[in-house]
Structure formats: structure tokens, C-alpha cells
């Protein structure tokens, strides 16, 4: 939701304790959104560049364009047209339902927004490709990334753990078909790794039945919530993310910052993880390759250490201040002459 923008210093001061509480009690979510967008619209000056996230309405975008302002949209995931096909195919393969909420109306709405905006930030190569596949003009797309904060980086250390120590492998995110967790659990069970797989995140209703066969397995832990996610990364040995559809998941950037060797799908980390440099980038459905990657990291502490050092080093280029500078340069370059 777009934040309510208020000029009055007095109102700003009391907003958290009084103003917003009253609004939330008196108005529905849809009316709060309308009010937020109205107040936001009132603050726009003639030469402002407007940056919108997916939750903003088509009506707001239309009003801003009629004012003559340049609008930049953030596309946090693949184009919905592409996402729906990927998830529909997996839904059919698994014989499950309600994997996603993407409708033709929401696809048409996204197409209309992308047609009307001036530029769109894409956080990953596959998001960029999905936009191109959906006929978004190449010169509208600003290819970038997401990132991490410096405090989320871990100082590199030499691994002195014995080579036969059980590994701690982590998955972090919503546990659903979209993230490919059902595939990961199958691969993990068949790989027979000396270690534990920690699946950290809430399990979506659509995948509950698929999780049941794995709940009694000793070396698989389902953890619904953790209060200190950074500690989880620090204590882990390997990060895994076999996503079928993503934007550019922040959890992958955190894995680099923690110096974790990564095994990810292209959706889970392409553009962030470099294959055979700081991890492996493997098609989510390539079962044999996933098992081989898990075994390779289990059997070689040297490879884990090599990937770990490369991961931590590569995280430097994804620090938010650098990503912000890169995004600013991209946009300024496009705006030259406008």
C-alpha cells in the first residue's frame, strides 16, 4: 500500500498514535487505499518522477500520467502472464489446486500498467525475459537487482569444522509449490546426505498434503518461524532454493552475505549466484543434478570453503548503496534529453 503523505508537522507527529488508529478503525482496507492514493496524488509536483510498486491502482497511474509525470514501476516478480503458465503447469503435474491467485483480470491489469508507465525496474534476468515475452518494449526495461545491507554480511572465517560433521542445509521462504519445496524434499531424501535440512517458513495450505510424507523424517525439520534469521544463516553450511517462479529473492542475497555455498534454480538465484563460482545454478526439475550438487558439497569441504569465500566476496557488489547508485545511473541515462 502507498503510505499516506501528510505535510503538517503536527499531524505527522501524531499519525502513528492517533491518526492512523482512527483511520484503521473507521475505514475498510479498500477505502484506506483510496485515501492513501488521493493524498499521495495531491503531493505530486509537475516535474516529479513517480516510483510505484505493484499494489498501486490503475486509476492512480492513469491520473498521474494525465498530470504529465514520468512513472517508473517496480516489477518484483515475473510478468503474471508467465508466472501463471509456470504455476498452472506445476499444479497440473502435482494434481493440486489453489497454488496461485493470478487471474486473467490481474494479467490484463499488469499489461495495462506496463503499457502506460514510462519505465520498469526488473530485478533479475528472468524477470526481464518474462517482460520481453509479454511484449514489454525493451527500451522501457531497467535491468537491475535487489541487495542486502552491510550489517547482513558475515565476516569471512576459515572453516575448521571436521569434514565428517553433519551438514546444516537451509531453505528460507514460504513453503509452497512456487518455491519448489516439494522438489527439494524429494531430492534431499534420495541424496541421503549426512546432515539436516531445515525448511524455514510457513507452509501454504495448497501443499500441506505433499509435506506429510516428509514430516516424520529425522533429518528434515519444518520450522514455521524464527526470531533471528541472521543467526540461522550464520549457523548453516549450505543454502538451497529450487524456486519455479520468483523475482529476485532477498534470501539469496542474504546467503551470499553469510558466505554460504548456494544451490539454486535459475529463478531462485540467476544473476546473483554464479554457477560453479559460489554455488550451483540448476534447473528446478533436474533431479539428478540437484542430488549430484548436494553430494558434491557434502563430500568436499574444500569445495564448500571455496564457494563460501566466493559467496561472501560477491555479496559486496549487491550492497544496497551500490544497487541504488546503479539504479540511479540507469534511470538518469534514460532521462537524458527528456
Name what the model sees in each region:
Residues 149, 157-179, 185-190:
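Conserved donor-binding/catalytic core segment of Leloir-type glycosyltransferases
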Residues 261-264:
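Short hydrophobic beta-strand element within catalytic cores of glycosyltransferases
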Residues 15-26, 71-108:
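Acceptor-binding helix/loop patch of EC 2.4 sugar-transfer enzymes
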Residues 275-276, 280-287, 296-301:
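Conserved acidic donor-binding segment of nucleotide-sugar-dependent glycosyltransferases
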Residues 244:
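Aromatic "clamp/platform" in nucleotide-sugar-dependent glycosyltransferases that forms part
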Residues 114, 225-226, 232-236:
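Short alpha-helical donor nucleotide-sugar binding micro-motif in glycosyltransferases
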Residues 208-226:
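Nucleotide-activated donor-binding/catalytic signature segment of Leloir-type glycosyltransferases, i.e.
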Residues 93, 98-155:
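Donor nucleotide-sugar binding/catalytic pocket of nucleotide-sugar-dependent glycosyltransferases
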Amino acid at each position: 500500500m502507498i503510505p499516506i503523505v501528510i505535510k503538517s508537522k503536527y499531524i505527522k507527529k501524531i499519525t502513528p498514535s492517533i491518526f492512523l488508529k482512527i483511520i484503521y478503525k473507521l475505514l475498510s482496507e479498500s477505502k484506506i487505499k483510496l485515501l492513501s492514493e488521493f493524498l499521495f496524488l495531491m503531493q505530486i509536483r509537475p516535474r516529479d518522477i513517480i516510483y510505484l510498486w505493484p499494489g498501486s491502482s490503475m486509476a492512480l497511474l492513469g491520473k498521474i500520467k494525465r498530470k504529465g509525470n514520468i512513472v517508473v514501476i517496480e516489477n518484483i516478480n515475473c510478468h503474471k502472464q508467465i508466472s501463471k503458465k509456470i504455476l498452472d503447469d506445476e499444479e497440473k503435474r502435482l494434481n493440486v489446486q489453489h497454488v496461485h491467485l493470478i487471474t486473467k483480470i490481474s494479467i490484463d491489469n499488469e499489461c495495462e500498467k506496463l503499457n502506460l508507465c514510462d519505465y520498469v525496474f526488473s530485478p533479475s534476468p528472468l524477470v526481464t525475459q518474462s517482460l520481453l515475452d509479454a511484449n514489454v518494449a525493451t527500451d522501457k526495461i531497467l535491468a537491475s537487482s535487489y541487495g542486502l545491507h552491510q550489517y547482513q554480511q558475515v565476516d569471512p572465517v576459515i572453516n575448521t569444522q571436521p569434514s565428517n560433521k553433519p551438514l546444516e542445509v537451509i531453505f528460507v521462504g514460504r513453503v509452497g509449490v512456487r518455491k519448489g519445496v516439494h522438489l527439494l524434499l524429494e531430492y534431499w531424501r534420495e541424496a541421503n546426505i549426512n546432515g539436516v535440512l531445515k525448511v524455514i517458513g510457513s507452509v501454504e495450505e495448497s501443499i500441506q498434503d505433499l509435506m506429510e510424507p516428509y514430516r516424520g523424517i529425522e533429518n528434515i525439520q519444518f520450522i514455521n518461524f524464527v526470531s533471528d534469521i541472521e543467526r540461522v544463516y550464520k549457523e548453516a553450511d549450505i543454502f538451497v532454493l529450487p524456486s519455479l517462479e520468483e523475482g529476485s529473492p532477498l534470501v539469496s542475497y542474504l546467503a551470499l552475505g553469510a558466505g554460504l555455498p548456494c544451490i539454486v534454480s535459475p529463478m531462485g538465484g540467476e544473476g546473483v549466484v554464479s554457477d560453479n563460482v559460489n554455488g550451483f545454478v540448476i534447473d528446478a526439475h533436474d533431479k539428478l543434478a540437484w542430488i549430484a550438487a548436494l553430494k558434491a558439497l557434502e563430500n568436499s569441504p574444500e569445495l564448500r570453503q571455496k564457494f563460501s569465500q566466493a559467496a561472501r566476496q560477491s555479496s559486496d557488489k549487491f550492497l544496497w548503496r551500490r544497487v541504488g547508485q546503479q539504479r540511479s545511473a540507469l534511470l538518469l541515462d534514460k532521462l537524458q534529453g527528456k
